[in-house]
Swiss-Prot record:
Ca(2+) 2 binds at residues 70, 72, 74, 76, 81. One of its GO terms (cellular component) is cytoplasm. This is Calcyphosin. The modification Phosphoserine is found at residue 40. Its main location: cytoplasm.
Amino acid sequence: MDAVDATVEKLRAQCLSRGALGIQGLARFFRRLDRDRSRSLDSRELQRGLAELGLVLDTAEAEGVCRRWDRDGSGTLDLEEFLRALRPPMSQAREAVIAAAFAKLDRSGDGVVTVDDLRGVYSGRTHPKVQSGEWTEEEVLRRFLDNFDSSEKDGQVTLAEFQDYYSGVSASMDTDEEFVAMMTSAWQL
């Protein structure tokens, strides 16, 4: 294990100590920091952003992380690749149940889930904001999709985005049985 791997392990542990939303919260926070929508951060932005969240990296660690995930030689890290590396690996059982849930949602079978795909399996009619007239059912479906739609809010969720979302959830669950039961119940598999 090299110094950057050790740094990633340190960050992963700090994130996981924050519970289910540790890595997901970090992802949302970094996307807000990325004001130019380049999907990248330099070492100073990374270090400052982590510090705001109470996660500590020294300058050398931040620079090492940026070098590892610098895909184009610009001196910045690729945000999505970095966040993916922070998430712990998943077992085959977890990957399989995520794929099964995605397949159920992808009614058209084209490899992406859209609002049209959701209409048959998710109803927003009973959502409190629909009931109050504040949102339409279409808005509820779109906002639901946005939970999974990671980089570009294009109204389409790929299997990779779905897996990324659930790898963050998976990190907070100790056993495969617990995770599989949650997914099976949530998606009526």
